[in-house]
Amino acid sequence: MTKLRKILIIILLAAPFLSVNAQKNAFGVPNLLKYDKQLLHFGFLVGYNQFDFLIKPQSDLSKYDSLMVINTTALSGFNLGIVTNLRMGKYFDLRFIPGLSFGDRIVNYTIQYDNGERLVNKKNIESVYMDLPLLVKFKSSRMHNVRAYVVAGAQYSLDLISAAKKKHAKTNEIVLKLYPNDFQAQVGVGFDFYCTYFKFSTELKMSFGLVNLLVKEENSFSESVTSLKSKLFQISFMFE
């Protein structure tokens, strides 16, 4: 995993330079003139993400052992994916980008004791998701070697390590358990840059969970939360 992270960091650091070079050539000699006429094309994706939660605590936290505040901390991760693009028309494409998302999230429980002392109990939630998004891409007219676009669609995600975490959890440790299946709505914007030999794209995308992931158990950490839905910000670099 460490070697993979190093490789991805190198790619992510190199991607902005590719974007700069692509922008320099945006109004030069047109590249890949027949590219957009292809019915089907493929590529790959590397990306940076921030996993987070849309959390809804119980309205009255005072009954949960002096629990005062519940909030979340977003942590950085990365994405890998395979791009499959189907041309639906001059301005529309259908995109299927199966991949893996690696990331962590933290749920913070702030507890105040009778003596006034405060303690923040952090529950770290690590996830590796297999993502299956289906997106519609609406493209602007091509301006020499660049075009803008927006995407929208839905994604099914399966947490591959959720079952393993439940199985290996210590008997005396209280952990937040999540259901492994998630469905999300997605929306994003991006730019396509037509390089000499391939198309390079940069994309910003948000994903919002549609289902409550929290497994209800008889402990204050679980009972004090009404709803826990996923939220994900992603910067993607695609080579097609």
Language-model regions: role of each:
Residues K56-N71, D104-S127, I161-L178, L214-T226:
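Flexible, solvent-exposed loop segments that connect beta-strands
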Residues M1-G28, F239-E240:
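Bacterial Sec-dependent N-terminal signal peptides
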Residues Q23-S76, E240:
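Short glycine/proline- and aromatic-enriched beta-strand/turn motifs that initiate or cap beta-hairpins
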Residues I70-T72, F78, V83-M88:
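Intrinsically disordered, glycine/charged-rich N-terminal periplasmic/extracytoplasmic linker segments
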Residues Q38-L40, A74-F78, E126-L132, V146, ...:
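Residues that define the transmembrane beta-barrel architecture of outer-membrane proteins
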Residues N31, D36-L40, Y48-L54, V83-A163, ...:
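Gram-negative (and chloroplast) outer-membrane scaffold detector with strong preference
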Residues P180-A185, G190-E240:
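Predominantly the C-terminal beta-signal and adjacent terminal strand-loop region
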